[in-house]
From Swiss-Prot:
Pfam family, one: Cytochrom_C
Role of this protein: Cytochrome c2 is found mainly in purple, non-sulfur, photosynthetic bacteria where it functions as the electron donor to the oxidized bacteriochlorophyll in the photophosphorylation pathway. However, it may also have a role in the respiratory chain and is found in some non-photosynthetic bacteria.
Keywords: Electron transport, Heme, Iron, Metal-binding, Photosynthesis, Transport
Secretion signal span: none
InterPro entries xrefs: Cyt_c-like_dom, Cyt_c-like_dom_sf, Cyt_c_1A/1B
GO biological process per UniProt: photosynthesis
Protein family: Belongs to the cytochrome c family.
Modification after translation, per record: Binds 1 heme c group covalently per subunit.
A GO molecular function held by the record: metal ion binding
Ligand binding (heme c): C15, C18, H19, M98
Protein name, entry field: Cytochrome c2 iso-2
């Protein structure tokens, strides 16, 4: 089943401790997520990323809906696996600032559907 943007808006309230989305969104503890869909990881303007996030972006990670859905249950494990699979295991050091986890698959699909509304199609 695809995500429901209305339900995703409710799920996104959990993310708002660190993130904002929308035309006036600013970086907080986490980067603003306006335009995040298909964006290269580690490239939100003006945000100071952790080394592992920056390395994943340099290694080619883009925030496709599928990658976001795979990332949210365990951000650090996802980034380490991505870097290892890309042949950059030596850069999989440290951890992302994102300690929040979203284990429920339907909630992940819903929040991606919500974020898609703020990204050019």
């Amino acid at each position: 089943e695809d995500g429901d943007p209305a339900k995703g808006e409710a799920v996104f309230k959990k993310c708002m401790a660190c993130h904002r989305v929308g035309p006036d969104a600013k970086n907080l503890v986490g980067p603003a997520l306006t335009g995040v869909i298909d964006r290269q990881a580690g490239t939100a303007p003006g945000f100071n990323y952790s080394a592992i996030n920056h390395a994943a972006g340099e290694a080619g990670l883009h925030w496709t809906p599928e990658n976001i859905i795979a990332y949210l249950p365990d951000p650090n494990a996802f980034l380490r696996k991505f870097l290892a699979d890309a042949g950059h295991a030596e850069q999989a050091k440290g951890s992302t600032k994102m300690v929040f986890k979203l284990p429920d698959e339907q909630e992940r699909k819903d929040v991606v559907a919500y974020l898609k509304q703020f990204s050019p199609q």
